[in-house]
Structures are given as C-alpha cells and as structure tokens.
Amino acid sequence: MALFTLFSLLGCSQLATKPNSDKPSLEQSKASAEDSLFNRMGGLPTIKTVVSETIDEVSSNRKTSRSFKDIKLPKLKESVVSQICKLTGGGCEYDGETMLNSHKDAKISTAEFELFVAVFRESLSRHTNTREKNELLKILAPMKRDIVTTQ
C-alpha cells in the first residue's frame, strides 16, 4: 500500500444578503475563494509539483520504497493531488479510499511516516510560503493515526 494517499470550491453563488444575515455576500464569497489555501499555495501546479517530488523521492528511498511496491505511482499522485486540492479549498473531488482503509495492511512505521513528512516539508518549502506550508501540514497531521500502523 502507499505510504501516504494523501482535498469543494467555496460557493460563489450567494446573492447579496441582508446586512445582518449569516450568509456571505457574493463579494465575500469571491474573496474567500481567492484567499483559499489552495489559491495561496499556487493552485494545482504547486500541488502537483510537491506531490510528484515527494512521491518520486520516497518511492525510491530504500527506507520507504517497500511501501510503494506494486503501486501505480501516476494514479497515486493523481489521488493525492485531488485530496490535497479538496482539503485546501480547490474544488477538486476526492473519491479515493480513506486513509485508514488504504493503509490498514501496509504496516507503515512511525519512522517511515516521519521520513515521508520530512520530504514533503522540504518540497513544500521550495514551492510555497511558510504560512501555507504550516496550514497544510496542520490539515494533514491528523491522518498520521490512520497511516501509521506499526512501531
């Protein structure tokens, strides 16, 4: 199984609302979409680059390569990109497995997970700002409990 199978466009269909309404105005919705983590990171080009660099490196690293045996790397990359896109507000659909289901038999150790995260962080640092990197890592961090299945 893959080490990390790592995401709904903010609605801009709201019409202007009453000043005391809880619903955002059209202008507020557009501003929210423009300010999404997805957009601040650089959108799909950045996400695709980071995911590709990370998976290429960890799938060929002797410490983690066993986790990628028999995995179709292009499909994995596509799935991880979709998941990150959705989680960051990019409007992509993610229809892949849950982290728990996709990693339950993989026997991923804490050391393997930490190596993956280190490579991912390095790639994020090369392609996005610290604020965005940290926001994304905070979103993804809870997945560790579903990915790490052995010590």
Region locations from a protein language model:
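Sec-dependent signal peptide recognition
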Residues: 1-3
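C-terminal motif of bacterial Sec signal peptides marking the signal peptidase cleavage site
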Residues: 9-11
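Globin-like tetrapyrrole-binding proteins
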Residues: 14-151
